[in-house]
């Protein structure tokens, strides 16, 4: 190591970092690895049948893109696989991982124009599996559609806020962009599949973006500015009408139930002889029969008992008086009418 290189090493800043995302990672150059790779590395991935036509059309562009990094790409239409390999000229040890991510994204229906961006140093990708996060298929489809939004509006807003390309395909969500944005996309997707609407996280990201512009709030807690949403999903369990109170906890086991002999000892029946027991049973039987006969007589005589009449109230009494006055006939006037009628008939 020369003196100039040792001086540069001593000038490295060791102060605490306020924002780790703002740090620039030094670029890896060809001079850092002049001898290349010792062994050949390769990665292969399968692709579905419906992607065969598209991949066949863009494969010359794929070979050109990986050829700039001294890699080799192969397309096997018989087995339905894509392979990327290192060559003797390959000097970047991590570029094979980037190329593997590129062919994985292309197999997940990501277009080549977007997938080739993953070969850049500041760009990464994340394939989020969402198929096993929800048990019922109806709920899974509903929450996945909630992530896309009406006419793709929700997905577009996520892309604008995170600077990432997001594609929802089947049981996976493919994201491509800066590493900070990938972290935010993963959080939004997982919370959406856990029944948290994505609009809440989008609103929080918009507020954070505005707060980042104010340097006075750099060292303050932002939780007071962020919206707090309460869960409105109430328990759908039907509450019983009569709730049984819980018994007090006792460390001792419950008392042993009394046997037939214990009950006979308590009542004194155990010490009676056979004739006395039979007489007691006969007496109990007679008392039961007498009670049953009494109840049966009451049930039979119930129909012959006259109902109790209520005494008439004041209004009813007046109505009865009016009816009786109307029903009275004037005998004298009736006689006079009859005499008149007889005279007319004689004349």
From Swiss-Prot:
Biased composition (Basic and acidic residues): 272-303, 318-329
Matching SMART domains: KH
Gene Ontology molecular function terms on file: RNA binding
Annotated compartments: Nucleus, Nucleolus
InterPro entries: KH_dom, KH_dom_type_1_sf, KRR1-like_KH1, KRR1-like_KH1_euk, KRR1-like_KH2, KRR1-like_KH2_euk, rRNA_assembly_KRR1
Protein name: KRR1 small subunit processome component homolog
Residue ranges of every copy of the KH domain listed in the record: 124-194
Biased composition (Basic residues): 231-246, 337-347
Region feature Disordered, mapped onto this chain: 231-347
Domain of life where this protein originates: Eukaryota
GO CC terms, sorted: nucleolus; nucleoplasm; small-subunit processome
Subunit structure, as described in the record: Monomer. Component of the ribosomal small subunit (SSU) processome.
Major subcellular location class: nucleus
Matching Gene3D superfamilies: K Homology domain, type 1 (3.30.1370.10)
Purpose: Required for 40S ribosome biogenesis. Involved in nucleolar processing of pre-18S ribosomal RNA and ribosome assembly. Binds to RNA. Required for female germline development, cell viability during eye development and for survival of dividing cells and epithelial cells during early wing disk development.
